[in-house]
UniProtKB/Swiss-Prot annotation:
This is Elongation factor Tu. Mg(2+) binds at T26. It comes from Streptococcus thermophilus (strain ATCC BAA-250 / LMG 18311). Keywords: Cytoplasm, Elongation factor, GTP-binding, Hydrolase, Magnesium, Metal-binding, Nucleotide-binding, Protein biosynthesis. Residues 19-26 are annotated as: G1.
Length: 398
């Protein structure tokens, strides 16, 4: 059966839900798809229930979301790919790969709790990975009788956003109940429509880097019998077309060339994938074990694998979930680039004996495996599964 072509008539925007565990991110995602299906029925707008978004079996048993669920829906103005980013601290790694795919995000805060530790962590992560536009959805307002309490929670959220260099005073805050909307209460359905209008207006259409050379961080790899190997991920910049030659860069000293024989998005064939699209790219002549998560597909010659660079980093404070103690020269954490962790050692500037939580510092890094990096590439510093710093590459050294 021939696959139907993907419709590009509406601008495409990547958004997602972030926030503390059990504050209602997945319920809100379900409510958005369900209310849009009721109010703006279309081929794209189909209701998704909580269980289908929270799909993997081990997730539901623990009542927490581990994987990153992708759903699609549309408003009158736009087509959205929506990521339900996991809330639990153990799954921050997935949050980082998920948040890296958002043009904007809806921060879900339960009005009954107010901001919690992971609310803070997700705001920080959003700032780190370059999610510039946040909208707040204060959930569960039906459970709070006191108007003053709601005002207090809103002020607290705005202060927290400002603390992390978001425009806390200007960010839209929508108060509603995802569960009530999901259950069909028209007052709360109206609020979901209001939320989507706000997303349409407040999250700008992203400036896509379509004129730059292709860069596609590989998130997943699988093989299709008889057709070859597929690498999937979100195109960071540039365009990928059928018959293009691409280079597989990173984790190995030598880059490898391949030819693209197919591009698809949401299981539909495309002539080309452009920056911002989540695509699967079929590669001719590449074995399943010759490409892996953490590598990138790039325009030939546009980016090289490196092991040594200078970076400007911010080390998180204990309150932000970072280290409680300083680190010294030759500290060896993991460096998280795009979709993967690589161990590296840190050399401190001459005269700097140690780095305290909360410090900014320029460091020299040497990775144990080469990674496709360039000036301006961002990374997180992690140890034992938690983020302890964030940084940006300022200079390539080798």
């Amino acid at each position: 059966m021939a696959k139907e072509k993907y419709d590009r008539s509406k601008p495409h925007v990547n958004i997602g839900t972030i926030g503390h565990v059990d504050h209602g991110k997945t319920t809100l995602t379900a409510a958005i798809t369900t209310v849009l299906a009721r109010r703006l029925p279309s081929a794209v707008n189909t209701p998704k229930d909580y269980a289908s978004i929270d799909a993997a079996p081990e997730e539901r048993e623990r009542g927490i979301t581990i994987n990153t669920a992708h759903v699609e829906y549309e408003t009158e103005k736009r087509h959205y790919a929506h990521i339900d980013a996991p809330g639990h601290a153990d799954y921050v790694k997935n949050m980082i790969t998920g948040a890296a795919q958002m043009d904007g995000a809806i921060l879900v805060v339960a009005s009954t709790d107010g901001p919690m530790p992971q609310t803070r962590e997700h705001i920080l992560l959003s700032r780190q990975v370059g999610v510039k536009h946040l909208i707040v959805f204060m959930n569960k307002v039906d459970l709070v009788d006191d108007e003053e309490l709601l005002e207090l929670v809103e002020m607290e959220i705005r202060d927290l956003l400002s603390e992390y260099d978001f425009p806390g005073d200007d960010i839209p805050v929508i108060q509603g109940s995802a569960l009530k909307a999901l259950e069909g209460d028209s007052k709360y359905e109206d609020i979901i429509m209001d939320l989507m209008n706000t997303v349409d207006e407040y999250i700008p259409e992203p400036e896509r880097d379509t004129d730059k050379p292709l860069l596609l961080p590989v998130e997943d790899v699988f093989s299709i019998t008889g057709r070859g190997t597929v690498a999937s991920g979100r195109i960071d910049r540039g365009v990928v077309r059928v018959n293009d030659e691409v280079e597989i860069v990173g984790l190995k000293e030598e880059s490898q060339k391949a030819v693209v024989t197919g591009v698809e998005m949401f299981r539909k064939q495309l002539d080309e994938g452009i920056a911002g699209d989540n695509v699967g790219v079929l590669l001719r002549g590449i074995q399943r074990d010759e490409i892996e998560r953490g590598q990138v597909l790039a325009a030939p010659g546009s980016i090289k694998p490196h092991t040594k660079f200078k970076g400007e980093v911010y080390i998180l404070t204990k309150e932000e979930g970072g280290r409680h103690t300083p680190f010294f020269n030759n500290y060896r954490p993991q460096f998280y680039f795009r979709t993967t962790d690589v161990t590296g050692s840190i050399e401190l500037p001459a005269g700097t004996e140690m780095v305290m939580p909360g410090d900014n510092v320029t460091i020299d890094v040497e990775l144990i495996h080469p990674i496709a990096v360039e000036k301006g590439t961002t990374f997180s510093i992690r140890e034992g599964g938690r983020t302890v710093g964030s940084g940006i590459v300022t200079e390539i050294e080798a």
